[in-house]
């Protein structure tokens, strides 16, 4: 889907954008920096903020292999790779760049991020503590989302700039915040909530391929997932109408 050429659908009352990289949660930031590490054989570039919950974009020799904490990740034909830092990560991240000539280890400190406490009251009790009769539905929804998020394609849209999905908005929920729903603490929020009038068009945050379209999930309502390549995906939730189909670019 071209982020400027079409719309995913329309708002209900708000939309929650969930940005994730495999099992590591990420937050897309617009104020980015480059760190370039040179040696005799090649240079390694990093774009991003090495803080808890951040998204890191890297570039190296396309023939190199890249490992993050000993886990091999994809490297594109032009040398791009990407990974996320967990919300609560406490250890430094070890990046291994390996080619035929040498193996280079890079250790980067991961800085702590302060998270907000968000209280939301007045929610329907069944949305805070679901009744037993919907457990199977929730389990099915979670599997559909998990399968879509697990896709690790060779697309390289992730290296382009992310944009917000709507032009005029109010942010009502931020990544990493601890939510207390109807007085009950819940797991941290792994997305961004936008409030806008009902019917507001929603666009993809960057080019990608639609991997999930569901009109009525229990927790997330109208839900769409885009694959941007290398395990990077964006999720669009709580939409009233959906105007894309699975497999659409």
Protein language model regions, located:
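Residue-identity detector for glycine
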Residues: 5-9
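Sec-dependent N-terminal signal peptides
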Residues: 30-39, 95
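Cationic-aromatic interfacial patches
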Residues: 44-113
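Surface-exposed, glycine-biased beta-strand/turn segments
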Residues: 107-220
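Beta-rich strand-turn-strand
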Residues: 244-249
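Zn2+-dependent peptidoglycan hydrolase active-site motif and core
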Residues: 205-243
């Amino acid at each position: 889907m071209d982020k400027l050429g079409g719309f995913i659908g329309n708002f209900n009352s708000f939309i929650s954008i969930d940005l994730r990289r495999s099992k590591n949660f990420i937050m897309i930031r617009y104020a980015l920096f480059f760190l370039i590490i040179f040696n005799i054989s090649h240079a390694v570039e990093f774009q991003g903020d090495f803080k808890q919950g951040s998204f890191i974009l890297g570039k190296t020799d396309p023939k190199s292999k890249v490992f993050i904490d000993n886990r091999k990740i994809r490297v594109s034909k032009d040398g791009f790779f990407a990974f996320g830092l967990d919300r609560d990560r406490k250890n430094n991240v070890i990046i291994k760049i390996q080619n035929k000539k040498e193996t280079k280890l890079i250790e980067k400190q991961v800085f702590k991020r302060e998270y907000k406490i968000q209280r939301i009251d007045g929610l329907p009790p069944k949305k805070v503590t679901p009744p037993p009769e919907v457990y199977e539905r929730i389990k099915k929804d979670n599997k559909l989302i998990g399968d879509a998020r697990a896709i690790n394609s060779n697309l390289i849209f992730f290296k382009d700039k992310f944009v917000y999905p709507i032009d005029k908005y109010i942010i009502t929920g931020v990544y990493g915040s601890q939510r207390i729903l109807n007085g009950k603490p819940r797991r941290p929020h792994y997305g961004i909530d936008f409030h806008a009038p009902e019917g507001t068009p929603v666009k993809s945050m960057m080019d990608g391929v639609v991997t999930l379209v569901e009109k009525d999930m229990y927790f997330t309502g109208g839900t769409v997932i885009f694959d941007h390549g290398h395990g990077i995906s964006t999720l669009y939730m709580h939409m009233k109408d959906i105007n894309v189909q699975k497999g659409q670019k």
